[in-house]
From Swiss-Prot:
Tissue specificity annotation: Somatic and germline tissues. Isoform Tra-2B is specific to oocytes.
Full protein name: Sex-determining transformer protein 2
Signal peptide: 1-31
Stretches for region Disordered: 1142-1194, 1267-1330, 1424-1475
Biased amino acid composition, Basic residues: 1178-1188
Organism: Caenorhabditis elegans
Entry GO terms, CC: cytoplasm; membrane; nucleus; perinuclear region of cytoplasm; plasma membrane
Biological processes annotated in GO: cell differentiation; germ-line sex determination; hermaphrodite germ-line sex determination; hermaphrodite somatic sex determination; sex determination; sex differentiation; spermatogenesis
Superkingdom in the source lineage: Eukaryota
Biased composition (Basic and acidic residues): 1276-1310, 1451-1469
Subcellular location: Membrane
Amino acid sequence: MKLKYNKLLVSVVIVTFVTFGLLLAECFGKSIDYQEKSIFPSFVSQGFFETRTNNEEYIIEKIAQTQENGVDMRSTLHFTQHGYLLNNISNLKIKFRQKTYTLNDVCFKPHITIFQQSSSSDQNEYPHYIQRLLLEMQRLSPCLIVTPLNCFYDIYRIHGEISNWNKNTDFLNRRLRNSYIEAIGENDERPYVKSNYGPSLIKSWADHMFDLPSKSFTNSTKDALFQKIKLWLLSIEPRQKTCAASIHSCDTPLDSEHYFNICTDMQSVDNFAEKKTKFKLEDVDEEFAMNLDCVDDQEQFIEWMQELEIRKMYSHVTEKPDYPNVVNQTCDKIFHDLNSTGIEFFDGSRSFSSTKSQFDTMQTEIVLLTPEMLLSAMQHSDFVNGFESIWTIEKAEELIHEFRLALKEETEKFKENRMSKMIRVTSRVLDNTVTTKLQSFSEKQTIHFVVNVHSLIVILFTIFVWSGAPLRSAFMFFVRDALTCLLFCFVCSTDGVIVLDTELIKYIIVLTLANLYFTTRSSFCTERLSRCIQREKRFPINSNFASLITVDTMTDSRQIQYFLSTVTKYQAAQDSYSNELFERFPKNWGCTSILIFPIVFVYWYFIDSNFDKICVSVLPSFCLAAGEELFAKNMFWKEREAMQAKQRLENEEQAESITGSSLEKLFAGNKPVSNTDKANIVKKSSIIRNQKPCLQDLSPGTYDVSNFMKYPHQASRIFREKIIGLYLRILKLRTLGVILCIPAILLIVISIGLLFIPVKRETLHTDSKQDDIFIEFEIFNFSTNWKIVNQNLKQFSEDIESIGTLYTISNWQKSFERFEQETNKNASAEWNILFKWINDEPINSAVTLFSEKSSGNQTIANPFKFRLRYGFDAKNETTVIEIVQKIDELLSKCSKNLSPKAVGVLYEHYHRIAVVWNLFAFNQLTTAGIFIILLSIITFIFAITPTIKATFLFSLLVVGTQIEVAALVHLFSLDHHQIYTNLALFAGFLAAWDPFCALLRYRRRILYKSETRRTPELASKRRVLLPIVATADIAQFFVLLITAFSILAIICSIVPELNIFFVPTVILIVIQIVAVFNSIIVSIATKQMFESEVRHYLHRDLRGSTTAVRVYNLVQKQRLASSLDEPQVELDEFSIKRSSPPCRYYAPPPKYSCKKRSRSSDEDEDSDPNQPGPSNRRSPKTGNKRVRGNGDNTELYIPNRYELIVSGKSVGGNTSAAWNGPGSTLEQNMNALEECFELGVDEYDFDEHDGDEGCELVQDMLDRERNLMNKRSTAQRRESRNIEKMKKSQENLDKEKSEEKISESKKNQDDSIESPNLPGTPANLPVDEPLPPVGRLYIVEHVLPEEYRRDPLTEPPSMEDCIRAHSDPNLPPHPRADQYPASFTRPMVEYCEDIYWTHRTGQLPPGLQVPRRPYDYYHITERTPPPEDLNWVPPAESPPIPIPQQAFDLLEERRRNHREQQDEAREGDLSDPEV
């Protein structure tokens, strides 16, 4: 963990120096007189985006109803449906500040202009009862609605609903009556007025009120006002009664009650023929008409009537109008003047438009008040009511906004009803904003939007990525955010001000990506290292090949999943805990790193002057993430050292062998406690207590090893498995790297060509008012004396006037110079003269704008804005482009001393088209060249021995992401193009760096073996499995990020206020997709570049598959040429200790045949008992032993026992077998056997005269067991005889011999099958090997029938069987020996690791004690799964957890495949001629 070998710390130091070097260079570039007054900067809004607002006298909401089939909507059916829509809008109510408002409160009412001819001061002088009368008339005035129903009488019903002409008349009458009583007093007579129509009440009370005498109300004024009231009453009266959709008469409203009356009339007619004639029904309507229920089918009946235009049958009551002729004229109706002439604004053709046909769209315009007009109306209402007005312009704007949203919701709701779907009419609110005035998007809304996006992404990553420690990761994410914002505010403010613009959004996006990436990296590192520590396993830390595990990609997917569950932890542990200085820096890396500074400075100075702010946005997150990762590694390293020290002390204290009672205590779980254990028990218990179980427990019947994958969230685990499976499939394609790399490079070349293709963009139609160009200077807190500012402005004015094609409209600087020459007598009073000039010439305030004056004598107000106005002499496109280019050069020249900004229609249009896009291509190519060099240097320093081809390909494809996005931005002429390309470059680097470094690290581990201590065991016939952890991490990161931005894009497309963010969000999604695609190409192409090197290394250096093969080849080379004819040295004769034991369950079981067993047993019966037969080996599928006696004619089947051969004779079959020493008991001999098993057979010899008594006891035991097995052996012999009668004895004998040879070869082959990550198991001794010499103890395995095999899930193991099966001194240590004390032998460990203990599901038998548990019992992260039981039958009762049907289908498919394989193998054996 030294600094010079830690690349993470070195990268942090380099990034820090680069960042602060750029900041220091920027400070030197500023004026030396610059002095910062405020410690914390201020924020100034310059507008993030530009939107259009309405500039008319009132707000118009347009509603369009379109017939999808293009049918002419001038019909009864569509007018009726349109009337229902307006009826719903008229009853629309919203809740605003604990009060209810309707359309009548916010709509514009043109009739009230009749009373606005006099001034407001005159109206305030009216008596209170007159003011009350005028206020109520204003409330009853109809709203301005432009609709085709204005041509019909139906509009009066709608206005009656909106203005409450027929509702709340009692309340209206009471208000007018109270104002009248207040005027006349208590003693006068009170008139009685009663009416259900609001305008009638106005007329009646107006007659009474104007009869009252008033001193302030003269007769002339009274008469004039009374005439206006009559005019108002006349203006709202209808002129003719033409109904759009009448039922009985025009006065009948179109509501459900009248439809209900019609339904009642239809239901009263029982005869369908009469009903059909009277109501003009069709044949298809018979079922509906006869089964009609007016209560239950009310809504369906109304819609059915509208579809069939059932109102035609009432044509005798009201004449059907000519709809095309009526609606094409001037349809004012309620809106007309005194002469009854129509107003042009209400022309009928205005209400129709065309999409598919001429009249398939019906339009309605509802006019609303502006916030200013609404504020005035509300204040006047509060004044008349005697309330203190609380209305402000902000509240008025909020009320208008809420009502417009409610109007859109109501329209959308109406569009989804059943009637609209039947007649296929779509209703929507049109966007009718007038593009006359530009207004910046609210910075408050933008800040809220950014915060919500931040929160959305953090929530998704917390759930799906940071599942190991979600709260801790989220907390560190926000800590990095806070520190970055704090540093940005201090070092990136311009003159103490941070401008809220699109550049700030770019820095926020860069911060978000970097912070998410570093937080994810830290979370993964900490989680994986903690799992390695929890296992307390001794990793091979002295080797760099801990993670070099090979697996055949064509093997079972479950084996691949099992391998993947360990490779992540092993690789993380190897990278962190390796003692070797593997990732060392290349030579001269210090000198090479110095080149980074001038390259970055060139890019900052000539290309992007804001690159220092990008570095500031990344620096805090990078530093904190690096520190967090190093701290975690150091902490886990110390914890690991403590565990290893503890294990060494335990091994030293328990080195002596445990026998007798100590052995019983040990297997009972009572471990001897030492002083060291007492000292460390507190620490170990705290470690285990703080750790959570990482894996799910496997049930005894399951074989799904994917549950071992340590990803707590199921979706994340499944996704990573899919990504890894796809990656493994891609690795099989040898030419895929070339197939993908060539098109990727061609796409970059094509993108470069697209940057120079002239794209036709929109042309601009201008008038004389759009020819002006304004040069503005915004100087925020510019603390210099006025003389320097004036000199800079004077120089700029001279430079811009040197452009000959511009003429000056206003130049405040020249005006000030003339004023200064006339009044300036003292050179020290220049600042005071400026303020005097501003105050004396107020006309200049339109040119010079400022908000407040500073108190000091040497400072300028904040903000202080200067404006110079010029005009274009020539308006042709070529001249304007040349002027724009000259202005851009002048603005860039003065950007250091001033902050000039050019605005204007012509300038902005041609600047975007001509200047920006022409310079954009050269800018991107220059940026690409600089970053290719920079990324190559970074790769050379921080990667592991990169090749030239791989480095160039990585740099090219990372920069290719930027070029491809730049071409896309160029083709679509998108704004903020520089922001998109910078983000593309940053995202491309993040997506490709980790997988690229992992590939290079893997390459060095394979090819640079001289720097390691061991040789990796790799199979030359299998493809090398590349590191896939980094690829899966990057895929999970970017897929979730793309998902978050996709959700954001959907929200932006739905919410109208966020539509302006839709296009930037889509561009960000495209950037991430392109970055991930190029990252995949980098990984595949880089892998195939050095794959040939790896294959050459395997064939040339290893010369085979394993280390043992390599040793054997070396021995063969050293043999003399003269001894080549001697017998070859067998590989199994070398005493080569394997690195780790083979896997027990990955080798498939041998094919088993019942016929073989029956023939074998019959042959044994008929054979000569005195003739010695071959000793069969133990089959992997059977656990019983068959013992043959040398002096007996019977076979003994002893379950779970081995035959002991002492002095060349079988103990189980010969009663006269001699034991070592006369008079020795069985217990003494068994103790001797145990001592022999502990010391090894080479260190203990038996005497052939010992053990007579022990042999007798053993013989008695065998006799008893022989009697118990007599019946079964007899039945088996009878069955064998029946089979042999069908064939000749000689053929059976030959066939049996051939089958024995085939089974023997299959056993040898099965024994040598390799596990997924280990070399082959050495073969056992040959079958025909002679018996060993006298005086040695050997174990001979025999085959027992299938019926006597122990069920490891229900029957406990036998200690004697473990001792007999695992006491061979040639066996390697048990693979789980490191989880038990050092004194535990292999049989003891095997007994403790039996499946009965590790997968126990039931209760223990009485008297049986559980053996000692391993060290990692409570936090074991991987366990060898049990073999799959294809004969498993589910229990009859229902399981506690529902099992899907797909699981049972999969089980049946496996069983069927297994049976087919067995049948094919059996048929192959029968068809073999040798058999």
